[in-house]
Amino acid sequence: MITAIVLAGGVGKRMGMEIPKQFVMVNEKPIIIYTLESFDRHPKIDQVVVVCKQGWADTMWGYIREFGIKKVKWVISGGSIVQKSINNAVQFLSDKCVEDDIVVIHDGIRPLVDEHVLSDVIVKCQEYGNAVTSLPYNEQIFIKETEKTTNKYIDRNTLRRVSTPQAYKYEVLHDAYDEAISQNIGMVDSAYTNTMMVDLGHTLYFAAGSDKNIKLTTTDDLALFKAYLREKEL
């Protein structure tokens, strides 16, 4: 069984929107539906749980029904930070997944996730027990000496950009969150499952990424998403 956790608990402050950004309409369709359609189409995804901003579950279910999304089985409430939202879903799945099941975690505001990226993260997880979507880092990275100066850089060949989707065997994921919460490791606002896993001593395995798999955080990101959609129509 392969279950996807899709996170849809954002508020959209950086976009200056009055509604959560995952519900912003693009071509008469909310952003979250573009994301869910990718999971609905993928032959290896069996079921989806959406972690939703509190108070928006009815809206989410309304769109799921309107656009014919079949694989979403549950919509649950998120937490105050993304790590608590993921943990809510992991705990919710405790009587719905067995130890060797694969759980794919994805940001709901990455609507351009494609079949190749999803397939590779699943295949790598089946082989190694986990997998994180990644890409080479193509910019130069400098370390601040002061707020105005630098005299050191990091060799970009030693770096990878990691995003979502990420995939983990359920038992390992569940045990990791239990350990992280009990020891207060990797549960801060800037953390995610991948950073928590490394903090707990796990080795992670890279899977294929895509430059199109952007996270819609700003209005510039939204404009880029619309441009990609226009490109697909050509």
From Swiss-Prot:
Family classification: Belongs to the IspD/TarI cytidylyltransferase family. TarI subfamily.
Record site feature (Transition state stabilizer), residues: 14, 21
Principal EC category: transferase
Biochemical pathway: Cell wall biogenesis; poly(ribitol phosphate) teichoic acid biosynthesis
Keyword set, alphabetical order: Cell wall biogenesis/degradation, Nucleotidyltransferase, Teichoic acid biosynthesis, Transferase
Coiled coil regions, renumbered to chain: none
GO cellular component annotations of the record: cytosol
Catalysed transformations (reactions): D-ribitol 5-phosphate + CTP + H(+) = CDP-L-ribitol + diphosphate
Site location (Positions ribitol 5-phosphate for the nucleophilic attack): 156, 215
Name listed for the protein in its UniProt record: Ribitol-5-phosphate cytidylyltransferase
Taxon lineage: Bacteria, Bacillati, Bacillota, Bacilli, Lactobacillales
GO biological process terms, semicolon-separated: cell wall organization; poly(ribitol phosphate) teichoic acid biosynthetic process
UniProt-listed InterPro entries: IspD/TarI (IPR034683), Nucleotide-diphossugar_trans (IPR029044), TarI (IPR034709)
MF-aspect GO terms: D-ribitol-5-phosphate cytidylyltransferase activity
Described purpose of this protein according to its UniProt entry: Catalyzes the transfer of the cytidylyl group of CTP to D-ribitol 5-phosphate.
Annotated EC: 2.7.7.40
Organism: Lacticaseibacillus paracasei (strain ATCC 334 / BCRC 17002 / CCUG 31169 / CIP 107868 / KCTC 3260 / NRRL B-441) (Lactobacillus paracasei)
Residues bound to CTP: 7-10, 79-85
